[in-house]
Amino acid sequence: MKNKALMLAPLIIFLVLCVFLLKGLFGNPKEIETGRIGHSMPEFNLPDLMQDGKRWTEKDLLGEVYLLNVWGTWCPTCLIELPYLTKLRGQGVKIIGLYYEQGYDSDFGDVFDINALRVEVSGMLAKTGDPYQFNILDLKRTLALDLGVSGAPEHFLVDKNGTIILHHTGDINERVWRAKFAPKLSELN
């Protein structure tokens, strides 16, 4: 009896692994859930990317519906979606940038040059259009981690009370906006 159970153990382990692998293989990577939908924005106190001395907290964002766009200049998909996001801003959508710095890690002795980043961001936004009311700098990725961000771009639709209503991984284009965001935004306004 013991031998039979020992012989079945590898088969059971194999079957469990197959289920997980198949789920990952056939799952939609755009449907990665953050776990924060229906919850408040995490607490944060982070600097403005472009303005020295200015800091933002989750409380500063209460009272208006907004789209939080996690992005970076290093992200080619972010570059592609900026003109469409700029069009949305022109239609009255409040978009706040969360600049996700991928290349910096103080644990490895990296030195961060805010002025160089500001020049890079300004140049990029001058070419593509600037959809942002303002940009929050998340240098150590603390807010991004609290939100469950896995990369960029990612988007969070947040209501007037600071509750996350919708999360989307990947770029926002007209199709995505109409299918996912526009209906939710209509409900909130």
Where do the language-model regions lie?
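Hydrophobic beta-strand anchors of alpha/beta hydrolase catalytic cores
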Residues: 67-68, 95, 155
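Short, flexible/disordered intra-domain loops and linkers
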Residues: 103-116
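Short, internal strand/loop/helix patches
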Residues: 113-158
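A short beta-strand-turn-helix
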Residues: 45-66
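Short pre-active-site segment immediately N-terminal to redox-active cysteine/selenocysteine motifs
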Residues: 64-66, 70-74, 151
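Thiol-/selenol-based redox modules, centered on thioredoxin-like
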Residues: 92, 154-189
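N-terminal targeting signals for export/organelle localization
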Residues: 1-47, 189
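Conserved redox-active cysteine motifs that mediate thiol-disulfide chemistry
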Residues: 70-87
